[in-house]
């Protein structure tokens, strides 16, 4: 301790280091009185830069994790009763998305998901499941869904029409030739009566009967195309024997007047006119 004599009052003024320490502690508690060091300034600027780069809505605390962007799987339409999309069945994706007009089953690779269709041994089989391979009731269906009796998926490709006949239930395609109209030739079956009478077939390539070409020499058309009278005394008859189309005897001009009309699908039509009714 130091003793200081004051010239004014000749009194002792004792000084100690305690006020100085108090001043120092008070100045240390004041933030404005402390100037940060260069290392502290660099650290604070680095933390501020990292906070600025952090996306909005996330926390910088160590305990919280940043949410990741969830990638939602693309949805495809399910259309029961419509053929399956060939591109989706083969590759598992479809570029048309919800605009595609075909069906996109739950499992494009085929097979049955046991979690979707219950197996109930002893119950009757679900007819809708056996036919289409799907059941709209899912696990609530009360019938059996055997996985080994799924129907074979029919896949349609946007290509040209196949010239083969595909019988249901057969693994190999039955090769069937087509006539000049695109109708099937089946020599071992009966003649298509619709085609024989009208020259066309409403069933097309799916018809199970024979459609011979009109110019074949060994086929005989057993039916006549008779129509109502166009005018009094005028009738139309068709020449049905294809083997003798060019060998038909023409009546003499003394009895009849022969007028050739036209040739339609191999038929030669003639108008037999009575000379008394002719103009």
Swiss-Prot record:
Keywords: DNA-binding, Metal-binding, Repeat, Zinc, Zinc-finger. Residues 16-39 have a biased composition (Low complexity). InterPro entries: Plant_ZF_CCCH (IPR050974), Znf_CCCH (IPR000571), Znf_CCCH_sf (IPR036855). Pfam families: zf-CCCH. The keyword Acetylation does not apply. Gene3D superfamilies: 2.30.30.1190, Zinc finger, CCCH-type. Transmembrane segments: none annotated. GO terms for molecular function: DNA binding; mRNA binding; zinc ion binding. A zinc finger (C3H1-type) spans 79-107, 120-148, 186-214. Residues 11-77 are annotated as: Disordered. PROSITE patterns: ZF_C3H1. SMART domains: ZnF_C3H1 (SM00356). This is Zinc finger CCCH domain-containing protein 42. The lineage of its organism: Eukaryota, Viridiplantae, Streptophyta, Embryophyta, Tracheophyta.
């Amino acid at each position: 301790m130091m003793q200081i004599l004051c010239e004014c009052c000749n009194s002792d003024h004792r000084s100690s280091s305690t006020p100085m320490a108090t001043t120092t502690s008070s100045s240390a508690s004041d933030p404005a009185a402390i100037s940060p060091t260069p290392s502290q300034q660099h650290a604070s600027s680095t933390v501020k830069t990292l906070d600025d780069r952090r996306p909005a809505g996330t926390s910088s605390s160590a305990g919280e994790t940043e949410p990741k962007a969830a990638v939602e799987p693309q949805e495809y339409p399910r259309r029961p009763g419509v053929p399956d999309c060939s591109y989706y069945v083969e590759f598992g994706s479809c570029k048309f998305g919800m605009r595609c007009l075909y069906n996109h089953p739950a499992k494009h690779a085929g097979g049955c998901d046991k979690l979707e269709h219950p197996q109930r041994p002893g119950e009757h089989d679900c007819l809708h499941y056996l036919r289409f391979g799907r059941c709209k009731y899912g696990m609530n269906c009360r019938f059996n869904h055997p996985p080994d009796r799924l129907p074979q998926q029919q896949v349609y490709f946007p290509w040209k029409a196949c010239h083969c006949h595909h019988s249901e239930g057969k693994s190999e395609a039955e090769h069937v030739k087509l006539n000049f109209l695109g109708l099937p030739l089946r020599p071992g079956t009966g003649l298509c009566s619709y085609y024989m009478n009208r020259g066309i077939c409403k069933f097309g390539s799916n018809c199970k009967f024979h459609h011979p070409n009109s110019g074949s020499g060994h086929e005989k058309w057993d039916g006549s195309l008779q129509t109502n009278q166009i005018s009094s005394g005028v009738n139309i008859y068709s020449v049905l024997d294809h083997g003798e189309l060019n060998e038909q005897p023409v009546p003499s001009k003394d009895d009849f007047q022969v007028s050739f009309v036209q040739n339609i699908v191999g038929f030669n039509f003639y108008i037999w006119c009575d000379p008394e009714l002719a103009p």
